């Protein structure tokens, strides 16, 4: 297998793992402002612990792949001197923070986190791990204040995207569980969670758009936009923006049509059809989110402008 292809695969896995590891507990333990948040967080704890350990393995593989790419030889994957050389780069320094944060999350999730400060620590560590991925992107090609601005925008973009994806994953799980149990109380909890996420979701989406716009401007600039469209980077970026716009449309559909329809159906005792529509919409949004992550994994490895 080509090292570049393996690098894209590792990046994709890390994006999925770290987005879920940060976003799901953020939603369940913080954004879900109700008495249900502890129960929802606890229902995910074992899964999140598994994801934390899986992310450690993926991150370790990522370091070896980076060593292979730097050396141009597969035996660099386990060469101590080459691995230490990678760790000495900005990418490697971020990798150390990522690994330390992931170990912290994995250890914390060994026990139930019933108090808000405990959950906040786990969420913060997961956020550090997710934000550290910014040091594997285009920002490192810049120097001085420009690099700092780009890295800040990258970190905000990653955290906001992780919060949105985690919320989608958690909400889909709540709706699927409610549909399976057919329990009216479970369905009402899911409906409340969907309705209550509206304000937070708006802030998250605004952050994604603003930080993404800053990133785009710093990578290609206004002058380079036309040239970038003619490159594979530009084509994939347009595809990402299209999928993102569809996700926005689905989020609006859920908020303004499907959730109110479910609430009305609950009061009338006719919930199955409304719940099915909402479940399918969230599933589609879920799939689109992972498609966007796949595109992001590739975009970070491509040159944005023609050579």
Language-model-detected regions and their locations in the chain:
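Polytopic transmembrane helical bundles with strong interfacial aromatic enrichment
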Residues: 1-307
């Amino acid at each position: 297998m080509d090292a570049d292809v393996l690098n894209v695969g590792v990046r994709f896995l890390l994006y999925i793992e770290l987005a879920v590891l940060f976003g799901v507990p953020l939603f369940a333990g913080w954004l879900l402002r109700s008495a249900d948040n502890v129960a929802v967080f606890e229902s995910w704890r074992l899964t999140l612990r598994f994801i934390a350990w899986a992310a450690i393995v993926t991150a370790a593989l990522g370091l070896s792949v980076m060593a292979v790419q730097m050396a141009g030889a597969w035996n660099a994957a386990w060469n101590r001197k080459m691995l230490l050389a990678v760790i000495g780069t900005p990418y490697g320094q971020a990798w150390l923070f990522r690994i330390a944060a992931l170990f912290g999350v994995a250890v914390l999730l060994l026990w139930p986190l019933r108090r808000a400060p405990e959950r906040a620590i786990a969420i913060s560590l997961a956020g550090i791990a997710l934000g550290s991925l910014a040091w594997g992107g285009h920002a490192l090609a810049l120097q001085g204040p420009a690099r700092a601005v780009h890295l800040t925008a990258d970190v905000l973009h990653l955290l906001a995207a992780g919060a949105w994806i985690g919320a989608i994953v958690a909400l889909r799980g709540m709706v699927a569980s409610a549909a399976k149990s057919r329990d009216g109380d479970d369905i009402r909890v899911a409906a409340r969670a969907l309705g209550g996420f509206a304000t937070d979701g708006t802030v998250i989406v605004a952050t994604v758009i603003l930080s993404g716009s800053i990133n785009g401007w710093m990578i290609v600039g206004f002058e380079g936009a036309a040239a970038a469209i003619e490159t594979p980077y530009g084509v994939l970026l347009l595809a990402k923006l299209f999928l993102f716009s569809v996700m926005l449309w689905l989020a609006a559909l859920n908020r303004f049509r499907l959730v109110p329809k479910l609430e009305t159906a609950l009061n009338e005792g006719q919930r199955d059809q409304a719940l099915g529509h909402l479940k399918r919409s969230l599933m589609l949004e879920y799939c689109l989110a992972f498609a966007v992550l796949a595109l992001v994994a590739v975009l970070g490895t491509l040159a944005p402008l023609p050579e």
